[in-house]
């Protein structure tokens, strides 16, 4: 998963006792065996969200009243390493694996491999309907494969346009306008960079997928096999338009000279250091800027001179404000930091922004299917989603939470986030997504070297090879 906003709001989870035993069963039984020992459902999540989901597990444990216990277990921080560890556990039939926090792009692969149980397998018969109730369309679509839900949305994410409000009275609505305004800043020797994710990695694929979807195109058809980058004149035009937009951003006058090596972290720093007038990034940007401004690291936002905010940095050196401090910091930051919808590729048509986030699925290796599904429903309950969003910095997947005043106070951009998630793009749904992503990022890099017509043909060829399972991955 891409750099998460959770790192700016994370709380430590309380570790459960090591004496708890894993859920056991007997080979002759179809259900989950009980003994005097406590049944434990292990929930594997990225290490970067350990505190957030450990806290969610503990809220559920209080609610469960001792019938069984949910234990959060950390996977590595990098998405590719998370996927590899889960795959090894699943192919090795590791019976300690019950619940999986899955990157939204893994659904098709895990479903095809039989690693994730369909939600319709819930013995209680409630999970499939519960996952769809009140769910935003984009996150829900990411949990579906071939018309069936194999996971439930747990958290989500969407990128916004962040801009220097003290320099830009009104945010640009299209990419043409964004590039033009950045070039105007270059001519006046102002901050002219458009900070985004340009190096050869998943972030570059996300950028391309958003621009492609916004232009009316797609990488694959709904069957997960048919490549649709250049198969019709309209699809080819959408692909070329997306590539032309990427090239114009990367080669604009005054563009970031290191754009071929940029990711979420470097984009954030470029903006905070005053080098960028615009930034494409996830909602963690808001808390990051307030934290670093209070520490004196943002030259155009000197919150370090505000004595009422000095206590907003906690003992761990992270942003841990009271409600009053958050409101004060946000009010001050709003003079310099603005947010707006992701710029349109086609004027008058809202961008379709690629979502991030996590889904939660029951692993085929669980010996306690009923308890695992019950745990899944508790972990993504409304109460847990609200706490995960407010305390963990991960946007909620239930649409009604965006009307909650407490949620709105912590997410000033809530209306834009909700609207983009309702009209979101998802990355290509395919069991071969990992190969597709690797090949696409290799073709797109370096972003400054894109030749729209030629690159469109190369992309089509490489994605077709990935789907066909041919050739070495670059």
Put a short name on every predicted segment.
Residues 2, 399, 419-474:
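Conserved C-terminal helix/tail region of periplasmic/extracytoplasmic solute-binding proteins
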Residues 2-108, 125, 454, 462-474:
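Conserved N-terminal structural module of periplasmic/extracytoplasmic solute-binding proteins
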Residues 87-89, 96-98, 128-166, 177, ...:
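A structural signal for short loop-to-beta-strand junctions that line the ligand-binding cleft
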Residues 104-158, 176-179, 326, 331-340:
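Hinge/lid segment of periplasmic solute-binding proteins
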Residues 121-134, 198, 217-241, 294, ...:
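Short, solvent-exposed loop/beta-turn-alpha elements that line the ligand-binding surface or hinge
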Residues 181-182, 225-260, 342:
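Glycine-centered hinge/linker elements that transmit conformational signals in sensory
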Residues 251-254, 293-392:
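Extracytoplasmic/periplasmic substrate-recognition and gating elements
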Residues 334-341, 389-442:
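Long, aromatic- and glycine/proline-rich binding clefts that accommodate carbohydrate-like moieties
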């Amino acid at each position: 998963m891409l750099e998460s906003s959770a790192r700016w709001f994370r709380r430590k989870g309380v570790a459960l006792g090591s004496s708890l035993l894993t859920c056991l069963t007997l080979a002759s039984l179809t259900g989950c065996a009980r003994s005097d020992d406590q049944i434990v459902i292990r929930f594997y999540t990225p290490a970067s969200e350990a505190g957030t989901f450990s806290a969610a597990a503990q809220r559920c444990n209080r609610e469960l009243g001792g019938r069984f216990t949910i234990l959060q277990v950390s996977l590595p921080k990098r998405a590719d390493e998370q996927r590899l560890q889960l795959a090894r556990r699943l192919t090795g039939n590791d019976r300690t694996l019950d619940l999986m926090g899955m990157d939204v792009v893994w659904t098709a692969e895990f479903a095809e491999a039989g690693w994730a149980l369909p939600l319709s397998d819930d013995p209680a018969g409630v999970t499939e309907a519960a996952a769809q109730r009140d769910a935003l369309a984009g996150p829900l679509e990411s949990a579906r494969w071939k018309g069936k839900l194999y996971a439930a949305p747990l958290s989500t994410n969407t990128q916004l346009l962040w801009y220097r409000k003290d320099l830009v009275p009104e945010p640009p609505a299209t990419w043409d306008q964004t590039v033009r305004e950045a070039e105007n800043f270059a001519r006046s020797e102002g901050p002219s960079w458009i900070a985004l994710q340009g190096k050869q990695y998943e972030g570059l694929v996300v950028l391309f997928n958003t621009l492609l979807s916004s232009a009316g195109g797609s990488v694959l058809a709904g069957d997960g096999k048919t490549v649709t980058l250049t198969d019709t004149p309209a699809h080819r035009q959408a692909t070329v338009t997306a590539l032309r937009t990427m090239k114009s951003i990367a080669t604009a006058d005054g563009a970031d000279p290191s754009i071929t090596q940029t990711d979420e972290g470097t984009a954030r720093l470029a903006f905070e250091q005053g080098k960028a007038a615009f930034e494409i990034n996830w909602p963690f940007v808001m808390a990051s800027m307030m934290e670093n401004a209070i520490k004196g690291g943002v030259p155009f936002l000197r919150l370090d001179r505000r004595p009422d905010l000095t206590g907003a940095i906690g003992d761990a050196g992270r942003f841990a404000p009271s409600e009053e401090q958050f409101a004060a910091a946000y009010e001050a930051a709003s003079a310099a930091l603005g947010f707006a919808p992701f710029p349109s590729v086609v004027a008058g048509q809202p961008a379709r922004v690629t979502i991030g986030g996590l889904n939660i699925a029951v692993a085929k290796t669980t010996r306690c299917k009923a308890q695992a599904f019950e745990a899944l429903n508790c972990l993504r309950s409304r109460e847990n989603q609200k706490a995960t969003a407010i305390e963990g910095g991960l946007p909620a997947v239930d649409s009604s939470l965006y009307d909650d005043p407490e949620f709105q106070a912590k997410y000033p951009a809530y209306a834009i986030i909700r609207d983009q998630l309702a009209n979101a793009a998802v990355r290509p749904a395919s069991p071969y997504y990992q190969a597709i992503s690797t090949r696409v990022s290799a073709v797109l890099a370096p972003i400054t070297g894109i030749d729209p017509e030629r690159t469109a043909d190369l992309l089509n060829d490489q994605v077709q090879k990935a789907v066909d399972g041919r050739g070495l991955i670059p």
